[in-house]
Swiss-Prot record:
Protein encoded by which gene: Mocs2B
Taxonomic lineage of the native organism: Eukaryota, Metazoa, Ecdysozoa, Arthropoda, Hexapoda
Native source species: Drosophila virilis
Designated name of the protein: Molybdopterin synthase catalytic subunit
Pathway: Cofactor biosynthesis; molybdopterin biosynthesis
One Gene Ontology term from the biological process aspect of the record: chromatin remodeling
Protein family according to the UniProt entry: Belongs to the MoaE family. MOCS2B subfamily.
Amino acid sequence: MDHIQLLNDKIDINLIHQLLIDQSCGACSVFLGTTRDNFEGKNVISLEYEAYENMALKEMGKICTDLRVRWPSLKHIVIYHRLGIVPVSEVSVVIAASAPHRVAALESVNFAIDQLKSRVPIWKKEVYEKDLIGEWKANVECPWPQYSKTSLRTFEFFSCKIDQKTENIPDKLVQIRVDDSELNRRVKCFLKRKRDEINLYNIHDFKQLSTNTELADSSESEVKYSCARTQSSLVKQQQSKSHLKVRREIDNSGPHVRPNYSSQLNKLTTAQHYKNDSFENSMLRNSRLRNIEEYMCVTSDGDNILNRIKNIENKILLLESISPEYKYFVSIFIIVYQMFILSNS
């Protein structure tokens, strides 16, 4: 028989023993999880447990089912977990099993402990002697990456040393002209917006789907108490290796929405091709263009000067659409472009 329960009071060990005893069983394995008084040099005074009780009980029942599939000889299974404040040295969780032989009892309890930590929605907070607010702790058995405080810190510039120092940078080469506080505000707003978008998409992408008639005919309570942590269903999208939907985005902002953008772009990107071997073979002019390509991170397109200039133009248009501040840099490029056209004519 399976005995699962969430308690707000102390767990009675004698009751657990009575639930396990059976005349056909020769082994009882019991695990008791207690509150220790220290963690990484801090004095712990208590643990506080919270749970999504409906889902927790369902997952505990599924664990019992998995145990009986793996070890059919199990007679009784007990999973008790205490909620609320648990002082030091008191029992917070009990996992026990009885079987005719000790191997099944010992192995099943060990397996159940790991499954309880990784699957059941129960959260633990450690309350310290000098920090009564406490700190929520994640189980190492959880499949997702562990939370790290360093992930929320600002970028540490000292970790990336720059040997070359540039002084007296012209203002026209600076794309974003704001102070550090404004820049940090923009970054935080961007991260917050992306986090909200991800949370919104997760609501649609990670949800319980009715895969059979039993789920379809189930009561509303079954759908109400669904949890993405344990009942997520990913549906692979067509022509994609992921569950994410691929959408075509329409950009309604940028230089391409300006009046006469196409004609202006054609003027910049089209030019008459003059066959001039002396120009193509000129090391001086070629080196000047190569320097611009290296600065703009553009791949050189052979010896065709016009195609190389067109690639640089496309890169500048891309940067201008990404960052509005980059439009101040366009005037410099136009001057360089006109110099090459005049030298080619």
